[in-house]
Amino acid sequence: RGQRNLLGAEKSATNADWYCEQRQTYQLPDEPNMFFGVPINTREVFGVLHIKGFIFDDTVLYSGASINNVYLQQQDKYRYDRYQKIHNAALADSMVNFINDYLLDFSAVHPLDVANRPRTKEIRSAIKAYRKNLSAHAEYQLESAVGFSDVLTISPLFGLGASGNELNQVIEDLFLQVQEKLVICTPYFNFPRTLRSKLARLLEQGKRVEIIVGDKVANDFYIPPEQPFKMAGALPYLYESNLRRFCEKFDAYIKNGHLTVRLWKDGDNTYHLKGVWVDNQYILLTGNNLNPRAWRLDAENGLLIHDPKQELLSQAEKELSHIRQHTKVLQDYSELEELTQYPEPVQKLLKKFARIKADKLVKMIL
């Protein structure tokens, strides 16, 4: 990703070019390199590095955000995300060790802040071996969950691929732990089948589910109808179609108050929140979008907080009240637009996708 432009954007200098330029501008020595490209697959569409976290000595700043102008609102718009600051030496060490022990395998991982970067085809076999090794062996090395009191703990988790994925398994287990209420944040409404079935079971059992998702105009791929259309601009409508079908299917639970669906929208700002809250007992911090791509293709991580004595309850409630601030609760699935109400170029593309069965493929990889 560091070697390409934004999806749908004009070709221009990439992040990797900028890293190289900065090294020259400041006349830095050739060693050590500071920026590395981690290839999770030989093609970006089939997997990228999506793990999160910044480590400063013994402090971990965990966020789904990137460090750039829009997330940090350096100009007019902002992209809304979560930021958690955790001071713990053991946790910080485990995250740094993970990078050194597993990510920085120099057979496949190369510096980006140099002019001569290897082409994918030159390291294709190394990339395949690298992904296989990460999927089979990579994990955060801790003897036990990191303790903050006699019971409050945090466990770092990693996952890659459809089988043997620890993070996926923990997320599925969290859904099974719900006694009263599950809260989910995701920017892209596109749950994998296993989570859809678990949500259905929770509702059938009389449990409460709250889903906080971005309105289509709060999606980072959204293009206003008055602007020239690009293919990536159809994605927010595809996600809204998913949401409409889901809400129609579970309309009775929306009506009886067991299912709450909130749409986040604040002007032309965008929404990028992910996370899971279970019964004031568990909080999952993650960059995982809870979609098929995260489930099968990308390298993902997360921090699972277990808080059986509700020591973090006031902080968790405060964060959720902030998240809900710019949301509207759906009363009926018909409040969401349907295909015939979409701009003509979007209608044409989504109809074409459906006709050639490409919509299912798109949902698997985006």
Predicted regions mapped to residue ranges:
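Catalytic-core regions built around general acid/base machinery
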Residues: 1, 170-177, 194-209
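HKD-type phospholipase D/PLD-like phosphodiesterase module
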Residues: 1-178, 217-279, 295
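Generic beta-strand/beta-sheet core signal
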Residues: 56, 63, 185-187, 212-214, ...
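Acidic-and-aromatic substrate-binding clefts and catalytic sites of carbohydrate-active enzymes
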Residues: 76, 188-194
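Short, catalytically relevant binding-site loops at active-site mouths
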Residues: 189-191, 216-219, 291
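A post-motif C-terminal structural segment
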Residues: 199-200, 236-241, 286
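Long, C-terminal catalytic modules of enzymes
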Residues: 252-366
